[in-house]
């Protein structure tokens, strides 16, 4: 949702979830994420085997990148490097010398991971039966920002 807002798309979350065919069991597939971006005319580049430095270059160019990684697992789950069942989408919006900063829909705050933590978690299965494994997948938004930081409206 944050990448849509960044690109100036004003659409209700329920409609986006319907377009993306999001379900409670498998979430939203990468294919359907890309469909939604295309539906709204957004220019994106998606690929696997990205690195933290690729994310830094995208941020430097003013381009947020959505990625899928492992997060918020329970105590009984395997180590993140071996876990493919706790996939979660986040958007890279910044960085420090040794960490990547995210907009995270599961947090009220921005979140971060060190480069090493990110590399250990940056994989997922793309839902459904016999899903493909994704490694280092990211989707970088090339559409320029249309977000108006100073725009406010009255809450009716």
Residue map of PLM features:
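Short amphipathic alpha-helical surface micro-motifs
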Residues: 26-27, 47-50, 74, 118-124
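Active-site-adjacent substructure of cysteine-protease-like catalytic cores
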Residues: 47-107, 111-112
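Residue-level signal for functionally critical sites in structured catalytic/ligand-binding pockets
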Residues: 1-2, 6, 16-18, 88, ...
